[in-house]
């Protein structure tokens, strides 16, 4: 009997293990994309399992985003009891960085036709929930989320997490509601049901992912899984320099009135930059929108392009 650690599989391509998960079927393309996110990033857990590849609009399917096994099971029971169907199961636990939660949300929102987004776990998670909130906010903004999202983030710093969700998600077409440990999965499932019914039968339309273009002339440094850009010319008009304070690990400093690394680029790349997304969100909403963090998801743009093509073809055929 031989056991291979999930995080060691990538070191042994000779074993032919494509996805280190105990599936009872070959992995779907979206599951392959999700696993590549998890494969080499040891920080926290990201598990994604697609429960329905076909999620037609009006079919009561929702995207499910859990945190921890037991709490996720209770939360799934709660939404199933309201008549919803699960397009997927997802778990981001073990104190993942905001960047991993962001990627999880982007992958969940690559399923056309879902009518809502439901995130709920144990309610007492021992992880910094503001990281989850920032990851969700970044994904929801990029997606211009237009379906309701009910997010239950019970655990450490849940009050701050709920504030982040409800403050920075206000301008989106879809309504976002944040809840904590005192709100039961059943109550939160009821809120999702009410919001979905209020919106009507329209399902989520998956959007293409535009090619990323690096900001010209920006100050930049690599992070563990991405790259951060600062348009220093825009920083001249910044009044607060609040990104310095917002940065949790305190790796930024001011130089000539603009933020730069206070550590070496190598230290940032190896993990001193935790990809918490705090500087980007602060600058976007409170200052000059001069900071952006690019977090690529290999294969997702191509996957979505295929979905969009099928949707457009179906729309054309429906009008013939």
Where are the model-predicted features located?
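Short internal beta-strands
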Residues: 146-153
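ATP-dependent carboxylate/acyl-activation modules
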Residues: 1-116, 141, 161-162, 166-170, ...
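Cofactor-cradling patches in redox/metallo enzymes
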Residues: 111-138
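Short, charged low-complexity linear segments at domain edges
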Residues: 209-227, 243-264
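Iron-sulfur (Fe-S) cluster-binding modules
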Residues: 208-227, 292-320
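Short, small-residue-enriched loops and turns at beta-alpha junctions
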Residues: 94-97, 123-128, 154-158, 185
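Short Fe-S-cluster ligation motifs
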Residues: 263-286, 306-320
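Iron-sulfur cluster-binding cysteine motifs and their immediate structural context
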Residues: 240-261, 278-298
């Amino acid at each position: 009997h031989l056991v291979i650690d999930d995080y060691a599989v990538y070191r042994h391509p000779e074993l032919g293990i494509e996805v280190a998960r105990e599936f009872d079927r070959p992995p779907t393309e979206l599951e392959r994309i999700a696993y590549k996110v998890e494969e080499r990033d040891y920080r926290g857990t990201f598990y994604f399992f697609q429960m329905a590849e076909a999620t037609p609009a009006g079919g009561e399917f929702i995207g499910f985003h859990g945190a921890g096994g037991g709490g996720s099971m209770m939360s799934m029971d709660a939404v199933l009891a309201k008549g919803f169907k699960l397009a997927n199961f997802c778990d981001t636990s073990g104190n993942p960085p905001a960047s991993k939660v962001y990627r999880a949300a982007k992958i969940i929102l690559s399923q056309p036709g879902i009518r809502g987004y439901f995130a709920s776990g144990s309610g007492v998670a021992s992880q910094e929930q503001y990281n989850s909130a920032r990851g969700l906010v970044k994904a929801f903004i990029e997606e211009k989320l237009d379906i309701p999202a009910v997010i239950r983030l019970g655990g450490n710093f849940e009050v701050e997490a709920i504030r982040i969700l409800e403050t920075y998600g206000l301008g989106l077409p879809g309504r976002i509601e944040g809840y904590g440990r005192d709100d039961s999965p059943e109550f939160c499932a009821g809120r999702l049901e009410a919001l979905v019914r209020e919106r009507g039968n329209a399902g989520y339309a998956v959007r293409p992912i535009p090619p990323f273009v690096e900001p010209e002339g920006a100050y930049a440094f690599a992070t563990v899984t991405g790259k951060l850009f600062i348009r220093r010319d825009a920083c001249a008009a910044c009044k607060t320099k609040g990104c310095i304070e917002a940065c949790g690990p305190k790796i930024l400093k001011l130089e000539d009135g603009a933020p730069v690394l206070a550590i070496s680029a190598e230290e940032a790349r190896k993990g001193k930059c935790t990809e918490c997304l705090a500087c980007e969100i602060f600058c976007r909403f409170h200052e000059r929108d001069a900071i952006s963090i690019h977090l690529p998801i290999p294969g997702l743009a191509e996957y979505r392009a295929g979905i969009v093509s099928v949707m457009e073809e179906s729309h054309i055929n429906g009008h013939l």
